């Protein structure tokens, strides 16, 4: 509102059937009380320093780098599973590739982040750490999520979109559910 701009994101990852099943398992108590989570979203689309300067690398045009382009999706999946974020505990942003070539033959300063490291606390008390980067070598697109609780944990990886893993301490071995 203050900037006079509207931002909207199509949060498509929460609609994946495996993510919906994982969410239901957590909310139904399959892992007990959620204590903490870790999530990541990596891509390598900005890894090459010769990638031309574009709106994605300009804070004024984009509003932010990986934190708005990618981490928003990770935060949404975590909120979908754990409920609302109550507090941002820490956020560190880093620009790995500081300059990019422009169409004018000059190099231009990248004014937003390539990597974001975020710590959150959710309304239910669970903590989460998120690492998001658009310079993740060898990762065309990779989103992952783990939630640990008093009685087990769940795990999801986007590169296996129809699977998620549930480990329950009373049962021992991890098992996959689809």
Label the predicted regions.
Residues 2, 157, 171-172:
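C-terminal helix-rich "cap/oligomerization" subdomain common to oxidoreductases
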Residues 3-5, 126-127:
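A short helix->loop->beta-strand "cap" motif at the edges of active sites that frequently abuts
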Residues 5-8, 13-109:
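Predominantly a Rossmann-like dinucleotide-binding segment in NAD(P)-dependent oxidoreductases
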Residues 48-51, 139, 173:
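Intrinsic-disorder/low-complexity coil detector
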Residues 76-168:
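Contiguous beta-strand/loop segments that form the cofactor/metal-binding neighborhood of enzyme cores
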Residues 174-178:
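Glycine-rich phosphate/pyrophosphate-binding loop
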């Amino acid at each position: 509102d203050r900037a006079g701009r509207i931002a909207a994101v199509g949060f498509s990852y929460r609609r994946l059937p495996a993510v919906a099943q994982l969410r239901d398992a957590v909310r139904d108590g399959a892992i007990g009380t959620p204590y903490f989570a870790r999530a990541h979203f990596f891509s390598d689309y900005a890894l090459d320093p010769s990638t031309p300067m574009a709106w994605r690398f300009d804070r004024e045009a984009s509003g932010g780098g990986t934190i708005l382009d990618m981490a928003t999706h990770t935060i949404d999946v975590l909120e979908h599973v754990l409920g609302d974020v109550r507090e941002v505990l820490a956020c560190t942003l880093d620009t790995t590739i500081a300059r990019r070539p422009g169409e004018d033959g000059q190099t231009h300063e990248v004014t937003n982040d390539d990597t974001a490291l975020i710590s959150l606390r959710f309304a239910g008390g669970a903590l989460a750490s998120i690492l998001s980067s658009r310079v993740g070598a060898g990762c065309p697109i990779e989103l992952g999520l783990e939630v640990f609780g008093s009685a087990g944990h769940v795990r999801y990886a986007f590169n296996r979109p129809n699977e998620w893993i549930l480990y329950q301490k009373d049962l021992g071995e991890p098992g996959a559910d689809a």
